[in-house]
Amino acid sequence: MNYIAILNDSDESYKSKVMLSIADELNSIGFNTDIYDDEQDMISSIENNARLCGVIFDWDRHDLALCQKISQINSRVPNFVFVSKNHGFEIKLSQLTINLRFHEYLIAHIPDIVIKMQQAIDEYRETILPPFTKALFSYVGKEKYTFCTPGHMGGTAFERSPAGALFYDFYGENTMRSDISVSMDELGSLLDHSGPHREAENYIASVFNADRSYIITNGTSTANKVVGMYSCHAGGTVLVDRNCHKSITHLMMMSDITPVYLKPTRNAYGILGGIPKSEFSHEHIEALLKAQGIGQWPCHAIITNSTYDGLFYNTQFIKQTLPVKSIHFDSAWVPYTQFHPVYQNKSGMGGEPVSGKLIFETQSTHKLLAAFSQASMIHVKGDFNESTFNEAYMMHTSTSPLYSIVASCEISAAMMKGAAGVRLMEKTIDLAISFRKEIVRLGNESEDWFFDVWQPDNIDEVCCWPLNSVNNWHGFKNIDDDHMSLDPIKITLLTPGLDRHGNLADVGIPASVVAGFLSEYGIIVEKTGPYSLLFLFSLGVDKTKSLTLLKALSEFKYFYDKNALVHEVLPELFSKDPVFYKNMRIQALAHGIHKLIVKHRLPELMYEAFETLPQMAMTPHRAFQQEILGNTCECLLSEMTDKISANMILPYPPGVPLIMPGEKLTG
């Protein structure tokens, strides 16, 4: 972070001379200076350069108006403003939060001015770092000699072997030196929640509107187990979203609890919907308990929000209506809901606490914010026993956490704090909506076919678009009003061949064919359905990536329309069986797969498979115990009718079990 923007647009030569001399002096001590003669050019550069650490301009010409423009982009960056001796100025108290540093046009004082600039920039760098990350950076800079773990000792051990040296060179010095032992007292403890680790947790909680937050270094699969182990006692009953992630199933295999499943909806495209409002009522839950012969009321509920395909619940309705005291929202796919108004009432931590309710929200920070893989968080709102919770936390947390994952969690929170987070989300949402509109435009301009987008006809309003019973663009049956809404940054593209009512056309282009082509292009699809493709527009997606995806989709249409040979469109697929694909063309491949889908009624079978829940012969925990005891056998899928499954059966992605352990397959 060593870029400084200089606006040198004064008509007075002595001012210009000072600006250029300042630039030379800064360059000589390692800064990169970018000089502009137009204000808007400089503003555009600031918007696109996160490594900027200072802005220099003439106060006589621009005064506070330019400061405010810069502050809207970065409220903390130092503004080094130069004033004439005879220039007066007024600043209101409310404007003193802008980081202003005043200097006079004195060419003889330039070395001293640059020293002061360096000090201000150092302060800026310190200010933007959150507590744990700051402590970690400071420790790494001290170059201490240690005689404890890890054994590579800041990378030294790797450099004693050719293979290790290559490994070291690939990851770099700071990666090695920041991998340190939990023995370092000045960094506190993740397990004891002390020192800078505790400061990081408090910092994160304030950013995410939680009463308490915990950092998880091995993913939300673990976060879910921590929450479940605390919330679900042995012999207890738990309400479980049937669209739960497999980690929730693993929790039920570990803990001796009885699940009562809340059944979500699903549409013809295979898109996972939400649990209907009626399923959250006291009467419905009572009926489910009676049907299973369960006498005790559920102690806990687990709800997936949002769904894998980007559908949010009105969480305020659930928090206020669901008659269970402890509710866990598995929000692995939406760690950004606190940072833009469109997500109001869409998150577990949003809004005020609900009296008598304990709310947990688990989030995969790494999935859609900026953090390393496995970085996850648990947020809590309400009263709970921290000591008991920490036993569950320690049960699932390594005693040798990778501190770079901890720091990335904290940095992610720092990036999203305040107006900066809103601005980041706004850019992400705007880019996603622009992409959606471009797909629609290309479709309207096409004489025959193009990809469609699963969304309402009108997306001019920037919001999470509601699913309702009036406009059935979504294809869900008997949808509740004011209950579910679509996240604008989760984009599902539809290929020809299937309509929203589940009707298969005579000709179709299965999504797997398109996904294969995109893979050749270096584009990886998040999830592929029979005729749908899910794309996630995260913070890391920029205009270049968006345009590349549009170009690739248009190119697929070009190849398809000219009926190119498979080896030209899908060379990787062709290489797997050159004889079979030798003279095959792309339309023949697509139509052939489509005919198989029609013949075997794949969308209909998928819908029915999720619509009818299997019979629970025993709990997942007891089924797993039978496997441990060796009371299981392997069998072919065709032989499973009337047998009890010892394991879960699931497609991945999305990792939502079709069959739970302990359920009987009834054909």
Regions found by a protein language model. Name each.
Residues 185-189, 209-215, 271-279:
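Glycine-rich phosphate-binding "P-loop"
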Residues 187-197, 213-217, 304:
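Short acidic-aromatic active-site loops that bind/stabilize oxyanions
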Residues 1-4, 50, 211, 234-235, ...:
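A short, charged/proline- and glycine-enriched loop
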Residues 167-175, 214-228, 282-292, 480-481, ...:
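Short, composition-biased local secondary-structure segments
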Residues 23-26, 31, 36-45, 58, ...:
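Conserved PLP-enzyme active-site core in the AAT-like
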Residues 13-30, 39-57, 62-80, 84-178, ...:
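Non-catalytic terminal extensions of PLP-dependent enzymes
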Residues 2-16, 56, 238-241:
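Short hydrophobic beta-strand segments
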Residues 6-8, 82, 150-152, 241, ...:
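Short hydrophobic segments within beta-strands
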